[in-house]
Each structure stands twice: as C-alpha cells, then as structure tokens.
Curated annotation (Swiss-Prot):
UniProt-annotated location(s): Golgi apparatus membrane
PANTHER family: PROTEIN SYS1 HOMOLOG (PTHR12952:SF0), SYS1 (PTHR12952)
Protein name: Protein SYS1 homolog
Bilayer-crossing regions: 13-33, 65-85, 91-111, 113-133
One family name in Pfam for this protein: SYS1
Length: 156
C-alpha cells in the first residue's frame, strides 16, 4: 500500500540502531545525573549506583539520591524518545526494551537477579514516566499542523 499515509516499513537495522541509541542515551544521562548528585553531596561515584539493586532504598541518603537520579533520568530519556524515536506508538516498546536490557545488566553485574522491592518500584515508576511523557511529547509533535504551501499569507 504505497499510498497509505505514514505507512510503517519494517527496517531491522533502523530498529537495532534506535535500541543502541536509546541505551546510550539511558546510560549516558544516568551517568550524568549520578555524577551531578555525587558532586553535590561529595560522594565517590561507583558503578554500584547504576547496577546494584541493593543500593536503591528509602532508608539511606545515597539510596534516596540514586532513586532521584533514576527518576530524573526517565524524564531525560523521554526527550530521547522525542528526538530519536519520534513515534508515539513505539515509545512504550523502546522504554520497556531499555529497561529490560538494564535488568540484564544489573543481573550480570551483581551475579544475582534483582530482588529488592525498591528497585522494582523505581523501575516501574521510571518505565511509566518515560513511556507516558515520551508518548505525550511525540504525539504533540505528530499532531502539529502540516503547512500546505510555503507562500506567504495575504490578508484579504
């Protein structure tokens, strides 16, 4: 159906490159947020903050700051969905994919499956925030008016 508006073409290379790009955005921005938080509280940065499920918690200040970094990262990644994915229908797919690979990364890093309830809660909140805000931003872009002519308007 060549005449269909916004027809979707299956392009595995594009999808793989978008997955890699979103993983890069996810870990790059998470690293920046964690570095900023560590600089503010004069803490030493560690990969444990990113990949150890036991770090996240309400009882310790580093745990709360790490949770805040994850939530801020979800907002930043929603902008990544807007600029790199650009389709509201695909935001949830890419969000879940990014977090699934993060789950695998945490599992490999700590050699055990994440079992901390706070880790799962933070990931669920981040998935919801990233998907909903990313979809909202993408839909706003998709619903913009399409200019039909480049001629200047005349007031008649």
């Amino acid at each position: 159906m060549a005449g269909q508006f916004r027809s979707y073409v299956w392009d595995p290379l594009l999808i793989l490159s978008q997955i890699v790009l979103m993983q890069t955005v996810y870990y790059g921005s998470l690293g920046l947020w964690l570095a900023l938080v560590d600089a503010l509280v004069r803490s030493s940065p560690s990969l444990d903050q990113m990949f150890d499920a036991e770090i996240l918690g309400f009882s310790t200040p580093p745990g709360r700051l790490s949770m805040m970094s994850f939530v801020l990262n979800a907002l930043t990644c929603a902008l990544g969905l807007l600029y790199f994915i650009r389709r509201g229908k695909q935001c949830l797919d890419f969000t879940v994919t990014v977090h699934f690979f993060h789950l695998l990364g945490c599992w490999l890093y700590s050699s055990r499956f994440p079992s901390a309830l706070t880790w799962w809660l933070v990931q669920a909140v981040c998935i919801a925030l990233m998907a909903v805000i990313g979809e909202y931003l993408c839909m706003r872009t998709e619903l913009k008016e399409i200019p039909l002519s480049s001629a200047p308007k005349s007031n008649v």
